[in-house]
């Protein structure tokens, strides 16, 4: 099943070639609401939730076919390998996500510019990985980051400090994050060894954190408290 939010790039033509697919249309308002809409339509006991730019590795496909979950098992999380224009990176800031879970137990909540699944029960890691093959044109990526930065700034300011992770508390300060993220991505995550693709990703994360820092400063300087 696919939830489409108004594709104009030929996506629907590709989907129409596979008679197994069921396509539902819904105007986009938030990632969480879009996912919850999709969940409300799922009739199976388990659901594998994926973005359009996810690709399952062969190892993960084989692993999923052999799963025999117990009654207490509510979900499984997978690690990601990020690709820049098809080139895999050694490490990224993209965390493991719960992608396979019992349909009736799942509910998405908004978190910053993104979303997070809430499950009650055992969630185990999977051995295989998912490739996150993001091929957005640079202009489109930059445009989307403006909206993401505004929502992320609101989340960081509105959430009590004790509920934020250490990383998010640093990000809420504004100025440290843009400087730290470049070195963290290049050195700690090994993107320096990925050549031009690694630098591209590091600069992407730098721009994203600069925009979040600007959004935070804008709110503080204008006296706005969303």
Question: Each predicted region: which residue ranges?
Answer:
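Short aromatic/hydrophobic "clamp" motif used to bind/position activated sugar donors
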Residues: 47
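Hydrophobic targeting segments
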Residues: 1-3, 195
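Catalytic-site signature of metal-activated, phosphate-bearing donor transferases
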Residues: 33-39, 57-222
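A conserved acidic beta->alpha catalytic loop
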Residues: 4-13, 28, 51
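Residues lining hydrophobic/aromatic ligand-binding pockets adjacent to catalytic sites
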Residues: 5, 44, 54
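Alpha-helical transmembrane segments and their immediate juxtamembrane flanks
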Residues: 225-226
């Amino acid at each position: 099943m696919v939830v489409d939010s108004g594709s104009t790039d030929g996506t629907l033509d590709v989907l129409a070639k596979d008679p197994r697919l069921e396509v539902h249309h819904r105007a986009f308002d938030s990632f969480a609401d879009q996912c919850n809409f999709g969940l409300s339509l799922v009739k199976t006991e388990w659901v594998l939730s994926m973005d359009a730019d996810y690709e399952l590795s062969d190892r993960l496909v084989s692993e999923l076919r052999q799963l025999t979950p117990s009654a207490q098992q509510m979900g499984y999380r997978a690690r990601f390998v990020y690709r820049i224009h098809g080139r895999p990176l050694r490490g990224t800031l993209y965390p493991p996500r719960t992608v396979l879970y019992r349909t009736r137990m799942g509910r998405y909540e908004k978190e910053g510019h993104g979303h997070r699944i809430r499950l009650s029960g055992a969630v185990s890691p999977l051995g295989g990985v998912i490739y996150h093959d993001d091929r957005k044109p640079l202009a489109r990526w930059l445009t989307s980051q403006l909206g993401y930065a505004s929502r992320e700034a609101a989340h960081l300011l509105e959430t009590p400090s004790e509920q934020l992770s250490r990383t998010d508390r640093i990000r809420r300060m504004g100025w440290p994050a843009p400087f730290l993220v470049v070195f963290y991505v290049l050195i700690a995550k090994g993107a320096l060894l990925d050549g031009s693709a690694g630098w591209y990703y590091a600069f992407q994360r730098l721009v994203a954190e600069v925009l979040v820092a600007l959004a935070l400063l804008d709110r503080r300087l204008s006296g706005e408290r969303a």
